[in-house]
Amino acid sequence: MRSQDLHQRLADLGAKPLHCGRIVRAWLQGRALDACTARQRAEDFLPLSVRQGLPRVAEELEGIARLHSEHPASDGSSRLLVELADRQRVESVLLPRGGLCVSTQVGCAVGCVFCMTGRSGLLRQVGSLEMVAQVVLARRRRAVKKVVFMGMGEPAHNLDNVLEAIDLLGTDGGIGHKNLVFSTVGDPRVFERLPGQRVKPALALSLHSTDAELRRRLLPKAPPLSPEELVEAGETYARQVDYPIQYQWTLLEGVNDSLEEMDGILRLLKGRFAVMNLIPYNSMDGDAYRRPRGERIVELVRYLHSRGVLTKVRNSAGQDIDGGCGQLRARAEGAAPQRHIRVRRG
């Protein structure tokens, strides 16, 4: 079911656009579809035919996704394993301070060598209402004021569904446009489509290396944009929407944590409308990769920050409960072994 299908379903019951908007907003807030307001009861607003049909509609919406299991973490986050109607599972993560990370695909085709999700390949796309349903399930547990499309999958490979979900959340869902974050490895179609959207989300770009060849090996199926081209396209969008690009950099010890790489970041991002997010790798048992030592991470942040690039450390939420993308699902269903890329540091 997509957004237009839901509106048509309600229209078939006799709902006018005003009725549809109220019902959809109630669902997006995790409330009953016929939830009343302080001033108006449902029976005084919704036609009888609509009220009689809502239980069936509610049943259909509940069937889109259900919570399979919840895994609270010590940092205040909570990882949700969500089961879709065909019994495929995706992950959502409730973040501290009102954030939620949602999945856009079951699996992923990009095949980032340090990502658990990519090991299974792409199994199927997640529909727009399946993404929104992840928000609904989360809102039944706590307030959600920000949604980041950074979970399982590459949003650019499911662009129509992701943009539809963003539009719905940024309108009837009541989430500010800056608080909807589209994360991508850098598909040219993203830079073509986002500027023309009614809801223009913030953009997070997966950089991970300033060396084009190393980035190609780390992200083997990403579009063939050079780091320079990626940053240039990001800067253009940032100036159009007037909020900075978030650049993502998963820190891998001995792979992309050298000063040469940090100098590459300075070369690309100094003077840009950008924030660099350094993300220490979240390892699992038997991993081929490790995160740098804590002292090293602090050194890198200071090195970049003191030279003019706003830099933050973004630890994966829920590190004590399989916090990395796809890890919870992988433990539940098994995963393929990890490939390892070695880099000689100068």
Swiss-Prot record:
Domain of life according to the entry: Bacteria
Top-level EC class as recorded in UniProt: transferase
Active site residues per record: 91 (proton acceptor), 325 (s-methylcysteine intermediate)
GO molecular function, one term: 4 iron, 4 sulfur cluster binding
EC number per UniProt: 2.1.1.-
Keyword field: 4Fe-4S, Cytoplasm, Disulfide bond, Iron, Iron-sulfur, Metal-binding, Methyltransferase, S-adenosyl-L-methionine, Transferase
Predominant cellular place of this UniProt entry's protein: cytoplasm
Protein family according to the UniProt entry: Belongs to the radical SAM superfamily. RlmN family.
Record-given protein name: Probable RNA methyltransferase PSPA7_3453
Annotated organism of origin: Pseudomonas paraeruginosa (strain DSM 24068 / PA7)
